[in-house]
């Protein structure tokens, strides 16, 4: 059953206003951070499970969804600073942090630099250096994700039909992908739609990627960590975001790191409720001691 958020609001943190949602009204807080071109509602499937006895928060990162979109200022350290201010504005003390994709990089950086500000860390299909070095080596699935930004499409139906052509989405489409993409777009009076995600911010994010310095963060993490990997490729059998050799390095450096691989899930389906495994692993980790 899809849970409605108990809060779907805006809050000012620092100089920006952020859109956030909260599912559940009791239990320990879990704060979720989404990926590069995503929005808070990508966590609806996980929230439907976890919000039964936890307060699950998710927010649109700067430049995404309904949060403010400054012209410049997009990097992992800047997002981590936003998170620090947001936790203060929401009066959340030592929450569990959960990040998917870019959100995992932000969560990792935050855990390394503000170790007293969280209780546990959950990294979903990211947390290690990208397996490509140049824009030319960027995988087709990421190019597909970015290509939708800044472009108007005649209708929401056509927008989603185009997305369903992607093999890593189309055959797995469900109510959670519907909810997610409904919140991805601005709807204009003529019926056309365009992604809310700020394209220039995403491009700047890529240019500033090195500031995340991921390998330097691992050993600084002081809290129990759960690392989930999507083992299924997207366009090919070996275009995963998180190679297995990277997992070995992460586990070696983070002192208390549990790792679970999901061979039949890809970078997107791991959060969209296609299988119950990710939610079960997260719940087990969250509820443990």
Where would I find each of the regions flagged by the language model?
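Conserved HGGG/HGGXW glycine-rich cap/lid loop of the alpha/beta-hydrolase fold
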Residues: 19-66
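Short helix immediately C-terminal to the catalytic nucleophile in hydrolase catalytic domains
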Residues: 103, 107-111
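Conserved serine/cysteine hydrolase catalytic core
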Residues: 186-253
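Catalytic histidine-centered segment of alpha/beta-hydrolase-like enzymes
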Residues: 262-274
């Amino acid at each position: 059953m899809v849970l409605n958020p108990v809060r779907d609001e805006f809050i000012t943190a620092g100089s920006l206003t952020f859109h956030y949602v909260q599912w559940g009204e009791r239990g320990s807080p879990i704060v979720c951070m989404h990926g590069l071109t995503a929005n808070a509602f990508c966590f609806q499937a996980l929230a439907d499970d976890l919000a039964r006895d936890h307060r699950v928060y998710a927010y649109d990162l700067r430049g995404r969804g309904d949060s403010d979109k400054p012209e410049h200022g997009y990097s992992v350290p800047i997002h981590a600073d936003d998170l620090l201010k947001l936790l203060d504005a929401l009066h959340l003390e030592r929450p569990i942090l959960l990040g998917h994709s870019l959100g995992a990089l932000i969560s990792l950086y935050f855990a390394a630099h503000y170790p007293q500000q969280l209780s546990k860390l959950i990294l979903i299909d990211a947390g290690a250096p990208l397996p490509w070095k140049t824009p030319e080596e960027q995988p087709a699935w990421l190019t597909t994700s970015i290509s939708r930004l800044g472009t108007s499409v005649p209708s929401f139906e056509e927008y989603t039909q185009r997305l369903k052509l992607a093999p890593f989405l189309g055959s797995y489409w469900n109510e959670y992908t519907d909810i997610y993409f409904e919140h991805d777009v601005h709807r204009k009076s003529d019926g056309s739609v365009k992604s809310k995600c700020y394209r220039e911010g995403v491009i700047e994010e890529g240019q500033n990627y090195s500031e995340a310095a991921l390998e330097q963060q691992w050993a600084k993490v002081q809290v129990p960590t759960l690392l989930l990997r999507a083992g299924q490729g997207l366009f090919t059998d070996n275009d995963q975001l998180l190679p297995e050799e990277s997992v070995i390095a992460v586990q070696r450096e983070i002192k208390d790191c549990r790792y679970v691989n999901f061979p039949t899930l890809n970078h997107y389906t791991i959060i969209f409720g296609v299988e119950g495994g990710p939610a079960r692993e997260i719940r087990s980790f969250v509820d443990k001691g």
